Amino acid sequence: MKTMKFGIIGCGLMGREFASATLRWVHLKDEITKPEIIGVCDMNPASFEWFDKAFPNLKYHFTDYHDLLACEDIEAVYCAVPHVLHQQVYSDIINAGKHLMGEKPFGMDKAQNDAILEALKNHPEVFCRCASEFPFFPACQKVIEWAKSGKLGPVSYTHLTLPTI
């Protein structure tokens, strides 16, 4: 099983959620890449405490995300920072050659989204994905099917509400 070494930028709730999810992936038996968290970054060093307990073998703790991006052994980054920072931080991650698992929105407006897309165009080796997608959720599969078939016509806007259980 291949291991993908991750760094996390943003150690608040969403960073902890992602980290917790990686611990649940270890039971999968298929040919899947296993995530390993080796570095964390947050402006508040007190947020490292939870990660140190959950991941006692962490190699890196940074308060400046540029230091995390400079680590050659970090292959991918999960980023959970305030929306207004997405364009700059996501672009820096991509330009550093790191795979990106980000949160929506990918830019606060079209210009910011275009900047992120430009970084991706310049780094085709980088895999980038939104962590908040539901591509395998049955309702989403149906909508994807309808969109691909043309049944919905041109899609210009979507809004999805999921029931809470």
Language-model segments: which ranges?
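N-terminal Rossmann-like dinucleotide-binding module
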Residues: 1-56
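Nucleotide donor/acceptor-binding cores
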Residues: 2-4, 126, 156
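Conserved SAM-binding strand-loop segment of SAM-dependent methyltransferases
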Residues: 59-64
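Beta-strand-loop-alpha-helix segment that lines the small-molecule cofactor/substrate pocket
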Residues: 76, 82-83, 87-133, 150, ...
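Oxidoreductase and adenylate-handling cofactor-binding alpha/beta cores
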Residues: 136-157
